[in-house]
Amino acid sequence: MRKKCSVCLWILVLLLSCLSGKSAYAATSTTIAKHIGNSNPLIDHHLGADPVALTYNGRVYIYMSSDDYEYNSNGTIKDNSFANLNRVFVISSADMVNWTDHGAIPVAGANGANGGRGIAKWAGASWAPSIAVKKINGKDKFFLYFANSGGGIGVLTADSPIGPWTDPIGKPLVTPSTPGMSGVVWLFDPAVFVDDDGTGYLYAGGGVPGVSNPTQGQWANPKTARVIKLGPDMTSVVGSASTIDAPFMFEDSGLHKYNGTYYYSYCINFGGTHPADKPPGEIGYMTSSSPMGPFTYRGHFLKNPGAFFGGGGNNHHAVFNFKNEWYVVYHAQTVSSALFGAGKGYRSPHINKLVHNADGSIQEVAANYAGVTQISNLNPYNRVEAETFAWNGRILTEKSTAPGGPVNNQHVTSIQNGDWIAVGNADFGAGGARSFKANVASTLGGKIEVRLDSADGKLVGTLNVPSTGGAQTWREIETAVSGATGVHKVFFVFTGTGTGNLFNFDYWQFTQR
């Protein structure tokens, strides 16, 4: 469905460009919202909302609600109704700039959702995921929590951060009837935290009581946030949930630990009269000496995304540590705004640094398009999945039949003349590269131009892609390269004369001299 919707989107872009008398593509296709040199949004070839991070084995994984464009009968874009939030998108990176697309986890399975492939057969939706890893019986086990709309929390398990996933209990983990959950207006937005002793905790909840006419007291102290202890198996709960009296609570629970202190963070609501230290739509935070609370309000650290990027909407975040640096991942309506001039409620993931002060307070985050810098160089002499890139000129990704990772290998597709992908800071070394190979599949054929630092930069090699006999008939092709030494952005520019998708692109690798 995402592929179909995305194709419809590019048709719309082409039609609009024709009406304006301008080509939708120049000699090389332009970026949408993540422009060359910037790190935000993390991706712009598809959307992703409510992001949360997991760091594992030298990579950071970002899990997101499956925002996807909805269309009116005339082909125009609707405002987001969240009807497509039944999957979880996953991307990962070792360097914070080049992101690998791992595709979608088909979470919800009720009423034939996800084409009957949905994992949680009882769930009609999968909103706002959270993720944790814990060693159980000597083996790392991964736990993906999600909200079934606003009615409860479910959990999936896997032996790797990208699956395959199963539903271990076949029902919700937490519902309104769970002890201590009474009074929660929206039982959603889970945040899971595993403490140093291996004990897990689940935070969730939101909303303001009073239905359509809350009082000032209800706006100020909704008392709709909860924390409950998880069992050793992470798929059961222990005892009763405790209330977190988060002032002006709206949604979006988060928990991180810094210097022995527990930080509960959340999105402040938009109603009533707010004091200056609790501004509407921003991320507030509280601290405690215990993961179960009580928590004390300390301040706020992330303005509503509309303050930085326009578009407004809800604010959703997660704080994480990666290679001894603290970051916050959040969403903003940047990609949809770039395409349509208005966000329409469709969101994309961003990351900026987060700083704790010496007194334990958190500095205001300066959200921006620049984002974070690349923390390590990419090794071009390793096999690199084509769906790993920092920037792109209007391509798509889709599930592949080519042999790849343990689950859900992807490839780059919807390749037209002038499209491209690029990676940041590949280190060829002093000796440089002597050859380049790629795994491709094609009915039409074309070329991959290998260029340095820009889409029209120094040409170091050209790979001719023949027809392989089909869009899923894979063949590894190799060509000589010259002049690729040192550290560079690497652009793979696609050319060809055929109509339609020129070829599919699975992976690439350089050989060292």
From Swiss-Prot:
Keyword Secreted: yes
Catalytic-site annotation from UniProt: D50, E251
Domain (CBM6) ranges: 382-511
This enzyme's EC code(s): 3.2.1.55
Protein name according to UniProt: Arabinoxylan arabinofuranohydrolase
Taxonomic superkingdom: Bacteria
Record-annotated disulphide pairs: none
GO molecular function: alpha-L-arabinofuranosidase activity; carbohydrate binding; metal ion binding
Similarity section: Belongs to the glycosyl hydrolase 43 family.
Catalysis performed (reactions): Hydrolysis of terminal non-reducing alpha-L-arabinofuranoside residues in alpha-L-arabinosides
Gene Ontology BP terms: xylan catabolic process
Thermal properties: Optimum temperature is 45 degrees Celsius. Thermostable for 40 min from 4 to 45 degrees Celsius.
Signal peptide: 1-26
Species classification: Bacteria, Bacillati, Bacillota, Bacilli, Bacillales
UniProt subcellular location: Secreted
UniProt note: pH dependence: Optimum pH is 5.6. Stable from pH 4.4 to 7.6.
Keyword field: Calcium, Carbohydrate metabolism, Glycosidase, Hydrolase, Metal-binding, Polysaccharide degradation, Secreted, Signal, Xylan degradation
Pfam families per the UniProt record, alphabetical: CBM_6, Glyco_hydro_43
PROSITE patterns, A to Z: CBM6
